Structure formats: C-alpha cells, structure tokens
Amino acid sequence: MDGASAEQDGLQEDRSHSGPSSLPEAPLKPPGPLVPPDQQDKVQCAEVNRASTEGESPDGPGQGGLCQNGPTPPFPDPPSSLDPTTSPVGPDASPGVAGFHDNLRKSQGTSAEGSVRKEALQSLRLSLPMQETQLCSTDSPLPLEKEEQVRLQARKWLEEQLKQYRVKRQQERSSQPATKTRLFSTLDPELMLNPENLPRASTLAMTKEYSFLRTSVPRGPKVGSLGLPAHPREKKTSKSSKIRSLADYRTEDSNAGNSGGNVPAPDSTKGSLKQNRSSAASVVSEISLSPDTDDRLENTSLAGDSVSEVDGNDSDSSSYSSASTRGTYGILSKTVGTQDTPYMVNGQEIPADTLGQFPSIKDVLQAAAAEHQDQGQEVNGEVRSRRDSICSSVSLESSAAETQEEMLQVLKEKMRLEGQLEALSLEASQALKEKAELQAQLAALSTKLQAQVECSHSSQQRQDSLSSEVDTLKQSCWDLERAMTDLQNMLEAKNASLASSNNDLQVAEEQYQRLMAKVEDMQRSMLSKDNTVHDLRQQMTALQSQLQQVQLERTTLTSKLKASQAEISSLQSVRQWYQQQLALAQEARVRLQGEMAHIQVGQMTQAGLLEHLKLENVSLSQQLTETQHRSMKEKGRIAAQLQGIEADMLDQEAAFMQIQEAKTMVEEDLQRRLEEFEGERERLQRMADSAASLEQQLEQVKLTLLQRDQQLEALQQEHLDLMKQLTLTQEALQSREQSLDALQTHYDELQARLGELQGEAASREDTICLLQNEKIILEAALQAAKSGKEELDRGARRLEEGTEETSETLEKLREELAIKSGQVEHLQQETAALKKQMQKIKEQFLQQKVMVEAYRRDATSKDQLISELKATRKRLDSELKELRQELMQVHGEKRTAEAELSRLHREVAQVRQHMADLEGHLQSAQKERDEMETHLQSLQFDKEQMVAVTEANEALKKQIEELQQEARKAITEQKQKMRRLGSDLTSAQKEMKTKHKAYENAVGILSRRLQEALAAKEAADAELGQLRAQGGSSDSSLALHERIQALEAELQAVSHSKTLLEKELQEVIALTSQELEESREKVLELEDELQESRGFRKKIKRLEESNKKLALELEHEKGKLTGLGQSNAALREHNSILETALAKREADLVQLNLQVQAVLQRKEEEDRQMKHLVQALQASLEKEKEKVNSLKEQVAAAKVEAGHNRRHFKAASLELSEVKKELQAKEHLVQKLQAEADDLQIREGKHSQEIAQFQAELAEARAQLQLLQKQLDEQLSKQPVGNQEMENLKWEVDQKEREIQSLKQQLDLTEQQGRKELEGLQQLLQNVKSELEMAQEDLSMTQKDKFMLQAKVSELKNNMKTLLQQNQQLKLDLRRGAAKTRKEPKGEASSSNPATPIKIPDCPVPASLLEELLRPPPAVSKEPLKNLNSCLQQLKQEMDSLQRQMEEHALTVHESLSSWTPLEPATASPVPPGGHAGPRGDPQRHSQSRASKEGPGE
C-alpha cells in the first residue's frame, strides 16, 4: 500500500498515546470540506464512534509481535476455513478491520512459531482491505522511505504497549470472577457495586446508533484500505466524542476480549443483522462452517440487505463495517471452537473467561470527569463560534449569498464523492462475483467438516466409557462411606457399653473403698472426738465473723446490681438517642432525594430556557432585519428560510452538546448518589442482621428466665418436702455439726461466688465496651428493640410479682422455721438415743465433702480434656473437608484432561484439512494475479480518457465563473433598486399619514366652531323671542329695541363666518382627495416596478441553477477520476503482496507438520502423568479414610467420657446448691446451738467415757478371741475332750458375726441417710441462691419503702409540732377568757345561764416521746438485712400510735369546743371568750381534719 495507511497508523498511535481528548501532533490539512454542513454532525457522530471503539483500542491495526501474549492456539495453525482473501492485514492495515486482524493474529501460536507464521500469512493479511471501503479525500502519498519508518515505529510501539497492557490487565483481573451474561439496567444498584456483572456490549451495538450514512450501493475495496489518508475531521471527532452509555467506557481490553472470541454469540448475530451486505458477506464467505452455521450466516446477510435498503441514506460509515467484521468473526470463532482457549501472558496460561471484563464504575467516572474537563474549553469555544456565526448570518445583509456559495461547495463535494462511489461500486460488483465462487468452495469444505464430526463422535464414545468408569468410582466411594458410617455406629454402641460397664465397676470400687474408709474412720473418730469439741468452739467464733463478711458481700452485691441497672438505663437512653438519629437520617435521605429531583427539574428547565433565549435572540434579530427591510420581505423570503434552517440546525447542535454535558453531569451525580445509597443499604442490612441476633439473644434470655422461674417453684416444693424430712430425721448434735461444716463449705462457695461475680462484672464491662462499639449497628435495630423493651418490661413486672410471691413465701418459711425450731428443741431431747447414727452420718458427710472436692478437680480436668477433644475434632473435620475438595478437584482435572485429549484429536484432523486447503489457496492466488494484470491494463486506458475529461472540465469551469460574476452584478443592481423603491414607498406612506392627520384636525376644529356658532344662534333666537314678547307688552322701552338690533347685527356676522368656514372645508376636502389620488397612482407605479424586478429575479435564479448543475457534473467527473486512481494504486500494491505470500505459505506448511507432531507427543505425556496422579490420589484417599475412622473412634470415646464427666459435674453442682440452701436455715440455728454447746460438752464427756468403755470391751473381746483361738489350736492338737467349750466358742463367734452384720446394716443405713442429706443440702444450697437474689430485690424494695416512710414520718413530725403549738395557744386563750369572765359582776353572771367548766385535755403524747420523735433519725445499722424488717415494723407501729393519739386529741378538743360554743351568745361582754378562741379554733379544726385525712391516707 501507499503511505496514507501508514499515516492512519500514526494517527491511531497518537490517539492511543494521548487518550480520547488529545489531538495528534501533526495533523493533516484538509483539501476541502468532505460532506455538506448539514451532514457534518452525522459524520462526526460516526467518526467519534469509530474513534471510541477502534482508535483507542490497543488491539487496533498495525500491531505486531502478538506471539508472546495472546490466546494459546487450540490448533497450531489458522482456522481451516480461510481462503486467500480473508488473511489478516499487516502493520499498515486500515482501522476498519482492526478487530478481524486481531482475531487472526490471536489465533496464531507462541513466540517461537509466530514469527514464521506471520511471514507465511502476509498475503492473507494484506488482501483483506479489498473487502472494506472508506470514503476520504486524497492527498499526495508519502515517500516510500517515510512510510517504512512510520510502519516500523508503529509496530514497535504497539508491541511494547500490548505486552505491558496485557500483563497489567491480567494481574488486575486474576482475582475477579467471570462476567455474567444477564441483561441489567446500568442504574441497577447491584451492578453499581459489582460492575463486573455488566453484560458485554458488542461494538455493533455502539455503531448501530450512529450509522446514519449507510448506502445501498454495492461496494468495492475500501478507500482507507487502499492507502488514502483519513480526513482531518477525525481529529476533531476524537476530541469532541461524547460518552453516551456505559458501553463507550469499555477499556482497552474489551476489544481484545471480543476479538479473542469472548463476545457472546447472540450479541454478535444481532449486530451482524444490521451490517451492510457487502461488508458482512465479505468475511462470512471466506470461512467454512458446518451446514447449520452456514445457513445462519446466509440469513444474516439477507437481513443485512433488507436493513440497508430500509436505511436510505446516501453515504457510508467505515467504522460500521469495521465493527461488523469483528462481530461476524466473533460468531465464526465461536462455531470453530476457539472461544474458551487460554491466553499466554509471559509464558503462563490464563483462562479466557478472565479477559474482556469491564472496569469498575469508579475508574469509569474518573476517566469521564477527566475527559469532560479536557473537552469543556474546546466545546465551549465551538459553541461560542457557532453563536457568533448565527448572529452574523442573521444580522448581515450578505448572509444569503454566503450560504448559497457554501451550498454550492457542499453539492460539489457530494457529486465528487458520488463519482468515487460509482468507480468503487464497479469494483464491489467484482467482489460479489468472487464471493459467489468462494461460497461454492465453502459448500465443498462443509462436506469435509462432516467427516470431522464423525471423528468427533468416536472420541465422544471414548469419553462416555471414561465417564462410566468415573461413575463406578463414585459408586465405590458411596459404598465406602456407608461402610464407614456403619462401623462408626457399631463403635459408638460398643464404646457406650464399655463406658457403662466401666462406670458400674468404678461405682462398685468406690462403694468398697467407702466401706473400708468408714471402718477406719469409726476407729479414728473415737480419738478425734475430744479435739472436735475444742475445734467447734473456735469454728463458732469463725462462723460469726464469716457471717458478717457474707453480709458485707451481700451489700456489695446489691450496690453492684444498682450500678448495672444504672448502666442498663444509660444504654436504653443511648438506644433512644440512636433511634432519633436514625429517624433524622431517614428524613435527611428523603430530603436529599427531593433535592435531587428538584435539581434534575431545574436542569431541564434551564435547558428549556436556554433554547427559549436562543430562539428569542433569533426572533429579535429577524425583527430588526424586518424593520429595516420591510419592503424586501417577499423578495428575501427564500434566503430567510435558508437562514432559519441553518440557525435551527446550529441551535440544535449547541443544545444537543449542552444536553449531553448536562446528561453526563447528572449521570455522574446519580452514580455518586447511588453509591452512597448502596453504602447506606449495606449498613442498614448489617444493622438488621445485628437486630435479628439481638432478638435471638432476647428470646434465649426469656427462655432462661422461664426455666429459672420453673426451677424456683420446683425448688420451693422440694424445700418444703426436705424441711418435713428434716423434722423427722435431724438431731440436735447432727444439725449442729452439719451446720458448722455447711457454713465452712458455704464460706468457700461464697468466696467462689464472689470471684464469679467479679468475673461477671468484668464480662459486663466487656459487654458494655462491645455495646459501645456496636452503637452504629444498633441504629437500624432500634425499632425491633422497642418491642423487645416492652417484652422486657413485661418480664420485669412478672419478676416483681414473682418477688412479691417469694417475699410471701419467705415469711411463710420464717414462720415454718420458727415452728421447726420448736421441733428441734423437742428433737434435742432424743439425742442420746441417736448418737451413733449421728457420728456415722458426720463421717459420711466428711467423706462426701472430700468426694465433692475430688469431683470438682475431676470436672475441671475433664472439661479441659473435652475442649481439647473438640479442638481436635474441628481440626479433623476441616482436614476431611479439604480432602473431599481435593478429591473433587482430581475428578474435575480428570474430566478436563479427557476433554483436552478429544479436543486435540479434533485439532489434528483440522490441521490436516487446513494443509489441503492452503494448497487450494495457492492456486486461487495465482489466478487472482493474472486477473489483476488484465485489470491494470484496463485502468491505464481509463487514465488517458480522464486526462481529456479534466481539460474539458477546466474550460467549463472558466465559463461558469464568468456567468457567476455577471449574475452577481445583476443581483446587486436589483437589490439597490428594490431598496430605493422600498424607501420611496415608505416616505410616501409617511406623507399620506401626516396629511390625513392634519385634515382630520382641521375638520375637527371647524366642526367645533360650527357647533359653537349654532349654539350661539339658538341662544340669540331665544333672547330675541323673549324681547319681542316683552316689546309687545311694553312698546315704550327703546333700550330693548337697541339691544335687539345689536343682536341681529351679531347674527349676521356669525352667519357670514359660517359661510366662510364652509368654503374652507370644501377646499380642504378637495385638496385631500387630490393628494389621495396622487398617492394611489404612485403606489400602482411602485407595484408595477416590483413585478418587473420579480421577473428579473426568476431569470437570475434559472441561470444560477444551470451553473450549479454544470459545477456538480464537473465534480462528479472529478470523483470518478480520483476513485479510479485510488483503486489503480491499491491493485498494484496488492499484486506485489500476493507474490510474496505464495512463497511464505509453502514454508508455513512444513512448520505446521512439525507443530502437530510436537502437540501429539506432549498430549501423550500429559495423559501418562494424569493416570499416575489419579492412582496416587486414590491411595491417599484410602489412607485418609482409615485415619478418619480412627479419629471417629477417638471422638466417640471422648463423647462417652464427656457424658460421664457431665453427670459427675451435675451431681457436684446439685450438692453445692443444696449446701447453699441449708445455709440460711442453719444461721437461725446457730444461736440456739451456742446455748446447747455447754450441755453437749457434758454429754460429750459421758460419751467419751462410754467410748472408752466400748474400746476396753473391744480390746477384752479381741484378747478373748486370741485366747480362744489359742485354746482352739491346743484343743485340736489334744483329744476332742472339750466339745462343749468348742460349742461355746462357736456361739460367741456367731454372736460377734451378728454384731458385725448389724454394724454393716447400720453402715448401709447411714450411707442412705447421708445420700438423702446430701440431696437435701444441694436443694438447700439452691434455695439459698434464690433467697439471696430475692433478698437483693427485697433490699431495693425496702429501701424505696424506707424513703417513703421517712418522708411520711417527717410530715407527721411537722404536724405534731404545729398541733403542740396550737394546743398551747388554745390553753392560753382559754385561761385569759376564764379570767375575764371571773372579773365581770356576779349579777350578770347569775342572770345568765351557769357556764359549764371547760376541760382541755393534755396532749396524750408525752414530751419525752415527742422529743425523741422530733429528733433526726439515728444512723443506719451496718446490717441492713437483719435490721430493716425490725426498723420497718417499729416505724409502722410509731405511725399507728401517733395517728391514734392525734385522732383522740382532735376528738377531745372538738368536744371541749362544742361544749364551750353555746356560752358565746349568752355573754354580753364586748369581747366574748370565744372571740379569741373562735378564730384560733377554726384553724385548729382545719389542722385536725387535715391531720385526720392525712393519717389514714398515709
């Protein structure tokens, strides 16, 4: 080819260097406009699309060195269906076929094989441009040296860029999953977060939107591929290209992925239906397929014909045809089977699924923002220049002529291009003939492909046999797993039986050891009894100190409980705050959504306002021109219409640009908002999950609360039963000793409990920290937590009710304890009879205490063992899962190996077929060479004809220019005439208007004067009649006569002036009528002149149209010439390339044979390795199964041990709980036991004497036994004389055996009683726990009651103080009143009724008690639990007594007052005695009534 394609490669290189917004550094200057201005924008859209899909892709034309990085060959040669016309183009290929060349290049082998194959397929690459067409203007081709330099530079640079790019993209994509083929909206939130899930858009879907300029003319070789340089307008389009959808954002590897066969078949077929017929068929016809795919491709070509006929535009889109070849090859490469081939990146195989994926939305938005910033200034400059052109075209008078000249230039370009089209359509028809021949070859090749399908059937049968083997292996695996499960079940059963037998054995051993220990302890206890009494006294003092410590601990626990309640309330307040914050955030989100909608509406309204302002600007300019040239309105209507059309087009362009910019801005804003909303949604999802977990925890807490309530009730019942049993079985000494031991154990337990509570406090602090960390998560869970809070409140109410019930039960228990204490006193009398049993039980209790401690140690050790076993079990489970996954991977690898083997067999057959096809290609290439030589000769003849035509065209040009100059002169003269006529017409109209106005004014003035004169005349006539009447009556008055004469003279003057005015009016009317006739004549003359000028204009238009036709024909001929010259140059270069390709193909055949042999050897080695690997994996699987069985046995044994340990642990915990329960009962007994301690010491002394006697008797019995044994031996040695003594000895021995049996029975009974007592102790411990909790709750309640009662007491004290003061005041008043009454005369006293003596009672409350009451309360004792109830009872008693006393006092005062009030009217003193008492009595009554009301109420 010539240097123009190299320049295109340079432009592609510059574009890929600088990105979509940068211009090439050395742009080509255009020879002239290529298309009319009204089609420039359409061409720009198409070119922009091509620049975005091809120019920016790194897999564009001119790429070499694709050997190292690219798809590994599924078979080591190109597809067998290629003939010479479909070979890929070399480094100087046009951009229109970039994708197809790239596919062919990628289907080649590794770096070692690629160099030879690239040379061998040179002619295939360079013959492809004959199938493509690109319309561009011609420039002089570059020199050959410069062309070679450009080619080399482009090739080197593209090789480097491709290597770097592929490695980088593979590193980025190695971790990403394969893309989904689902179709989604680009605004889907899931796709915003996971952009790799977007469907892959084919380049056809992009070019389809902008293929405005397609033509239905059959095409020959593409102009761009024939060596013509691209029009410089592409530089602008690359700059002003807009991003209209996410498909335009596709990164550089999307083309690589599509060309590699990753484009889905449905997308490709859809795109190919919308191609032009010749561009689709040119590639489809050269690839042999199976009959199904052949029919499909014929259908697609027919659909392409129909689509191209429907789309009736008269130009071409080269980018569209280039995309069509890529899409078509995407289908074909899928049918051949190269879609899933792995890629080579630096020698490593990478699966094809990882290529061709989209970048993230973030990268896309950043790139769009950068491009938008780069393009903003240039786009604004273009818009401003267009606005200036609009204003200038509208405002200037010469705009019509300029637009006509531009139209002429555009039409000339159009005719020249149509000439090129005619020349190229001839070549296209020849290409269609070649297509028919190639289709015949394709039918022949399809038969060969059927033979290949039969071979694939045989390989499929072999694959079926292998799959059956895999199924048998799977069946064996299932059988093994079943056997494993059966063995595991058997092992578990055996282990369980073993464990039960072991447990029985251990129990038997423990019983034996206990019996032996009891026998020994009975001997030891005799000696230790003396020491125990001394120890008991010390333990009593220690127990009192321990009790005080326990009470202190109880107070600390209550304070901790209050602190935890305060923390819970603070957390609830924090939760409410977060709920409010959540509501505020939701409102803010709604507000933001509304603001976004308002912004969008504002943008739309701004766009509408912009358009409206532009239209107003245009309309104002048109009004300005119309006011200046109103007379030229009809003459310039056509020019104004053209100007309006052009202005509308430019306005639409500017508005479209602004809409696009606003659209990109809105899309970016929407993307950002959507990402924010997605973040919020994820956060809310997390919060919902946490809320669900919290709800589950709340449900668990509720369940535990219910269980505890049930346990509490059961324990209360058991407690009652146990108390009944205790009354029957306990003795005073036993209860004392057990209480001492129980207090010791309880002290230990309380210490452990304290440690647990401290641990719980630390865990609560940890949970508080966690809650503070999870504040953000709790925002969404607040709504759910409300319901939880309500349920918790209900639970709290239930707990309060439960606490009330428990407090009642506690009081009942206290009463029962009082009763039982009496029973205990009764039982103390029976201690002497049950001393032996008590000693045995005490020994058993000590043993059980030791056993409990041993159980604890065993439980802790076994817990550790269980945790270790759980960890080992988890580890083994994870190893099992890994082994299973490895087994699945081995099966998958085996299947892939079998599939690879069958694929390689198919590839070998295809390679052989392809070698036969290449020989046929050589022959067809030789035929083409002969045809080209004949075509060259015909082209030389055409060239001579073209020279003659150009000379004739030059002469015609000169004539046309002269005619155009003459027409312009005539048009300017005509314009001047029209202007003059218009100015004359306007001046005449103005004069007419002024004269008409003056005439109307004069007529108005005259009519007013006439009316005035008429009115004066009527007045004068009336006066005259009056005077005449008066004159008739009185003829004597001369003065009246004179006045009448004067009036008549006046009347004559007025009539004279009236006649003058009428004459003037007639003259004015005549003058105005003459002027009107003259103006009408002038207007008629002007209209005649206007008609003449219109006829002259029509003649000028006819001349201009003829000139245009001649110029268009001239340009048409020029276009034909250029098209012929281009095709001539292309054919010459194509001929030379075909000659070089013939030699390279022969060398390529030898290379292909070697590669096939190497591939077969490598495949056999891989098969052998896979077999070895499968065998090794099966062996390792069997070993792992054995390991798993052994581990399962171990796990089963560990489970049995864990169950045993759990039982022991439960028994120990029950014992501990019973011990705790008994603690409170024993606390009440401690004081009584202290009193009984002295009695017990005396009894102990007696008991020790009895024990000493028993021991002495035992020693005597043993000595007698030894003596008897000696005597027996002596008697046996002697004659049997002492048979009687032997019988006596036997009888004594039987008695001893009976005593031993009775002792054993007593031991058994004591064991049973010990067990019962242990159970009772465990239940007592549990009761103690529950009572502790209830006591804590009671403490909180009693504290509240205490505060309330203290407040009431303070009120009562205040009332008492006021009552005392009022009482004293009343007494004083009464004494004064009595003294006054005594002083009055006795006569008055005797005449009045005798006054009853008033007796005011003293205050019933003593002064000492009042002082004590009015004093501040004493300090609270340090033992609140013991003293609270007594304090409360005292307070209640005091309140009741105070209230009763106040009521009695109020009644007495009221009675005394009522008895005293009847005396008041009888007394005639001015100040009666009741005068003082009355007003004071009322407040007294009020205060008394108030006190009486407050008393019961309180």
From Swiss-Prot:
The annotated regions of Pro residues compositional bias extend over 27-36, 71-81
Tell me what effect the entry lists for residue 135 to A: Loss of interaction with GOPC
Which tissues is it found in, per the record? Expressed in all tissues tested. Expressed in liver, testis, lung, heart, salivary gland and kidney.
Q: Which Gene3D superfamilies does this chain map to?
A: 1.10.287.1490
Coiled-coil zones: 394-1459
Query: Where is it localised?
Result: Cytoplasm; Golgi apparatus, Golgi stack membrane
* N-acetylmethionine modified-residue sites: 1
Residues the record lists as Phosphoserine modifications: 18, 57, 272, 385, 389, 465, 983, 1392
Cellular component GO terms held in the UniProt record:
cytosol; Golgi apparatus; Golgi cisterna membrane; Golgi membrane; membrane; nucleolus; nucleoplasm
Q: Which InterPro entries match?
A: MT-Golgi_org_protein
Region described as Golgi-targeting domain: spans on this chain: 172-257
Topological type in the membrane: Peripheral membrane protein
**Site feature: Cleavage:** 59-60, 139-140, 311-312
Map out region (Interaction with GOPC) in residue numbers. 121-141
Which UniProt keyword terms apply here? Acetylation, Coiled coil, Cytoplasm, Golgi apparatus, Membrane, Phosphoprotein
What does UniProt say on post-translational modification here? Cleaved by caspases in apoptotic cells.
Q: Show the ranges annotated as biased composition (Low complexity).
A: 315-324
> Where does this protein have compositionally biased stretches of type Basic and acidic residues?
789-801, 1376-1387, 1440-1452
Quaternary structure and interacting proteins, as annotated: Homodimer. Interacts with GOLGA7. Isoform 1 interacts with GOPC while isoform 3 does not.
Q: What is known of its domains?
A: Extended rod-like protein with coiled-coil domains.
Stated role: Golgi auto-antigen; probably involved in maintaining Golgi structure.
Q: Can you name this protein?
A: Golgin subfamily A member 3
User: What is the source species?
Assistant: Homo sapiens (Human)
Q: Recall the taxonomic lineage recorded for the source organism.
A: Eukaryota, Metazoa, Chordata, Craniata, Vertebrata
